[in-house]
Each structure stands twice: as C-alpha cells, then as structure tokens.
Amino acid sequence: VIPAKRRKIPIFHMEAGNRCFDFRVPEEINRRIVDHVSDINMPYSSIARGYLLAEGFPADRIIKTGSPMYEVLHYYMPKIKASDVLARLKLEEEKYFVVSAHREENIDSERNFNGLIETLKMLDEEYGLPVIFSTHPRTRKKIEEKAIKLSESIRLMKPFGFIDYVHLQMHAKATLS
C-alpha cells in the first residue's frame, strides 16, 4: 500500500477498522497502517466504523459496506452443497468437529498452544467423534517438533479449499477456530 500511496494511487481499504487490540499480532499492525494511509476506508460493520471514528478518521472517509460473505456464499452455494468431502473423509453429518488454528499468537505461544492441544484431547475424550483439524504448515511443524501424540480420531489434515471447508463447517457438530 505504501508504494501505491507514494505514486498517488488512491487507496480504498476493504475490511477497514477491524481491530483485535493486540500489537503482537502482525495483522493488527498492518491493518492500522493501511487504514491510516487509505483515502477511503470501507469497514464491514458499525463496530469497525466506530473504531475508525474513535481514532480520529473523518466520517467522510469512511463508507460502511457490510460483509461480502453473504454474496460469496450465495454465489457458491450450489457447489458447496454438491461437495463430496464428507464421503471422501467418511464422515456423517453432525458427527464430527472441524478445527482450524494457525494464528501466530495461538501456535507460537506455549501457553496458548498447550491449551489448544488439551482442548483437542478433551473434545476427543468427551465426545468420541472425529475431529477434522485443518493444520496449516506452522501448526503441523509445531506438533511434529513437540512430538505430540494425538488420538487417531483427531485427524491432521492439510488446509481445505473454500468449497469443501464451508461444506464441512455447515455439517459439523461444531467448528472451533
């Protein structure tokens, strides 16, 4: 965004104003920089708009757009419904969990990572259902480095594509992210 701004190219920032208020999260720093150099900020929610206003952005540089996810899901819903991912993974509707965890603050923090692993083990013990754990490379590396042994019902899977992942979420007992 900075090279574009230096070339006087107008910057319109979708997802503007999103905040987690944790500067250890790289995305938080990026969000704030991009918001501040953008000509127009387009937050999805009134909450995000409020954060921008509280930071001193003029109201005429903020256009609340709403989330595009409704349109995206509506457009892809026929393909999502047609996904055969449950059959490929031998899963039954409402009889499995979906888990995704890859954020730096959850994987690189020993406390948070250990809490995640304990949660997976408790989920397995309490429900006895398959846990489809979409493991990003940093997550898989950490599990391997620590030589963590998980039950066979906790399946470490490569990240799924959008269509299959939404289908999994729609039919899971619950999604943990």
Q: Where are the regions that the model predicts?
A:
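Short hydrophobic/aromatic-enriched beta-strand-loop microsegments
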Residues: 10-15, 60-66, 152-158
